């Protein structure tokens, strides 16, 4: 039995244009959609297995990327946004009506990823943003109900479509976190 990873990757990766200038994210409401403008392309796009990220119906993973926070603007129906969990490091702003997470923001200025907002590229109304580059927090899908004996197949499928599976973030992002921590300790 094949597990649905995520609709945007189940049939393989669709490569980005390499020149994506940004676009508009729209929630899943039929009308009065929350719309969020994004300037520029995304970075560190990945499939995420954590239990905090928003996933479309039936998906095992979310697909999430980052953009500089100054490149994120709520365009329409911002009054429908609410923070999902005020105690979480990433303040996920979701539509109150449909539950779609529109962007996640870190307010702690000492956090290694402060200044980057987390978004779900599949919500772009436009095509061409960066394709997912890796899979993170893969083992965490067990916490959301995946059977442990399915994990080898999931990892194999991720590799087959071109996503290296990690049980944390990618090495480049882990290095960025460690560098931030080392600099903070040296200060």
From Swiss-Prot:
A GO MF term: S-(hydroxymethyl)glutathione synthase activity
Binding site for Zn(2+) 1: 27, 29, 95, 98
CENP-V/GFA domain boundaries: 20-167
Coiled coil: none
Keyword hit for Lyase: yes
Signal peptide limits: none
Residues reported in the UniProt entry to bind Zn(2+) 2: 48, 50, 53
Gene Ontology terms: biological process: formaldehyde catabolic process
Keywords per UniProt: Lyase, Metal-binding, Zinc
Family as reported in the entry's similarity comment: Belongs to the Gfa family.
HAMAP family for this protein: Formald_GSH
Family matches, as NCBIfam families: formald_GSH, PRK05417.1
Job description of the protein: Catalyzes the condensation of formaldehyde and glutathione to S-hydroxymethylglutathione.
Protein name per UniProt: Glutathione-dependent formaldehyde-activating enzyme
Originating gene: gfa
């Amino acid at each position: 039995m094949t597990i649905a990873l995520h609709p945007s990757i189940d049939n393989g990766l669709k490569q980005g244009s390499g020149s994506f200038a940004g676009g508009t994210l729209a929630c899943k409401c039929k009308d009065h959609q929350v719309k969020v403008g994004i300037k520029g392309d995304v970075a560190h796009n990945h499939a995420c297995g954590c239990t905090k990220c928003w996933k479309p119906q039936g998906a095992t993973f979310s697909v999430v990327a980052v953009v500089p926070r100054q490149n994120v603007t709520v365009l329409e129906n911002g009054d429908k946004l609410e923070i999902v969990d005020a105690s979480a490091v990433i303040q996920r702003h979701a539509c109150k009506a449909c539950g779609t997470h529109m962007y996640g923001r870190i307010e702690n200025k000492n956090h290694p990823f402060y200044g980057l907002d987390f978004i779900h590229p599949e919500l772009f109304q436009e095509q061409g943003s960066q394709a997912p580059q890796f899979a993170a927090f893969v083992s965490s899908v067990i916490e959301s109900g995946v059977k442990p004996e399915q994990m080898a197949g999931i990892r194999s499928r991720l590799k087959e479509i071109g996503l290296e599976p990690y049980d944390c973030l990618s090495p480049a992002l882990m290095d960025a976190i460690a560098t931030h921590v080392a600099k903070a300790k040296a200060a």
